[in-house]
Design a protein with these regions (language model features):
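Extended, charged catalytic domains and RNA/DNA-binding interfaces, predominantly
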Residues: 1-97
Length: 97
C-alpha cells in the first residue's frame, strides 16, 4: 500500500503506478491528509515537505481506480475498518478494492 504518498520521503510516482499491484492508497494518517495538493499536515513533518502532483486527487484525475485506506502510525496502530459480506481473505480484499 503506498504509504504517505505526498511527502518527499515516500512520494508515489503516478507514472509508475499500477493498481493491479497496489489497489489501495493511503489517504490519511496521523501526519495528515494526502487527499489533495496542499492538504493540512501535522505541524511536525519530521523534516519532510509535501510534494505537489502526488495527491490521491491527482491520481484520480489521471484516471486511476483505487481504494483508500487511513489509519494511525507505527507500532501496529494502523487499523483500517472494512465492511465485508464474507469473512474470508477474498471477501475482505474485495471489499477494500
Amino acid at each position: 500500500i503506498p504509504h504517505h504518498p505526498g511527502d518527499n520521503a515516500h512520494t508515489l510516482d503516478w507514472n509508475a503506478y499500477d493498481p493491479a499491484f497496489a489497489p489501495l492508497v493511503e489517504i490519511f494518517q496521523v501526519r495528515g491528509s494526502y487527499e489533495y495538493d496542499n492538504c493540512p499536515m501535522h505541524p511536525q513533518l519530521y523534516g519532510r515537505n509535501v510534494v505537489r502532483k502526488h495527491s490521491l486527487q491527482y491520481g484520480l484525475n489521471r484516471g486511476f481506480d483505487f481504494g483508500f485506506t487511513a489509519g494511525g502510525e507505527h507500532e501496529g496502530v494502523g487499523v483500517t475498518g472494512v465492511y465485508a459480506t464474507e469473512f474470508t481473505r477474498a471477501g475482505i480484499f474485495g471489499s477494500v478494492t
